[in-house]
Design a protein with these regions (language model features):
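Short active-site segment of divalent metal-dependent hydrolases/proteases
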Residues: 118-119, 123
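Post-HEXXH active-site segment of zinc metalloproteases
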Residues: 93-112, 124-155
């Protein structure tokens, strides 16, 4: 309990989300998401420990835009933790605006990270339907479990992989709005939130965060 009280005291100093961040999430979650209640706060203790996972198959949009793997495993740190409507960010992942320049410009890495964390906030705000709690969200970070590993060709339960699905949708919607998997992701999200159809969302003129050697052909087919 003392730890939770300390977290709440810390988050009282956090920033609210920007107008462009609100626009980005409004296109995905609409009125089902209350942006006014969200607070972002850098927390030095987030990501202090490293974890090692097997390299993920290069089958998702998220993995295809990243630098190619250099070995059979990779090391990573927790980038953020959500406590109710407060997002505690690893200093290496802290930005003053994760959607700077949006909708004309988007940094996919930043936008996808932000969307992932906002989905956990959304899950809490809609907990009557999702059954979500911050303690359930912490299960993402337990040892030996890669929170981003899923097969995009399998039927996926939103309640189990919701944050990763929204993240993947942002990636596919931006790079391949008319692709088959983009439509499947849209259908999955539309069953639980008022997401805007990918072909109705303006495409940014400038897209950052994509590795220079990434093959975008058929990236979300």
């Amino acid at each position: 309990m003392r730890v939770l009280i300390a977290l709440l005291l810390l988050t009282a100093c956090g920033r609210s989300i920007t107008s462009s961040e609100r626009l980005l999430m409004g296109e995905v979650m609409g009125a089902s998401f209350n942006a006014n209640e969200v607070r972002m706060l850098e927390a030095g203790f987030i990501g202090m420990r490293t974890r090692t996972y097997p390299v993920r198959p290069q089958v998702t949009c998220r993995e295809k835009i990243a630098p190619p793997p250099s070995g059979p495993t990779f090391r990573t740190r927790t980038a953020g933790v959500v406590a109710w409507q407060h997002v505690l960010t690893n200093p290496d992942w802290t930005l003053t605006n994760y959607a700077a320049g949006y909708p004309d410009r988007i940094n996919l890495v930043a936008a996808m990270y932000f969307a992932h964390e906002m989905t956990h906030v959304w899950q809490w705000q809609n907990r009557a339907a999702t059954g979500y709690s911050p303690f359930r969200g912490l299960a993402e970070h337990k040892p030996g479990v890669d929170p981003y590993l899923f097969d995009p060709n399998e039927e996926i339960n939103f309640l189990e992989m919701g944050a990763s699905l929204v993240e993947e949708y942002i990636c596919c919607r931006t790079l391949a709005p008319e692709a088959a998997r983009t439509q499947r992701l849209y259908d999955t999200l539309a069953a639980v939130m008022p997401v805007q159809h990918p072909t109705q969302t303006p495409r940014p003129v400038e897209v950052l965060g994509v590795h220079e050697d990434a093959d975008l052909l058929g990236i979300c087919d």
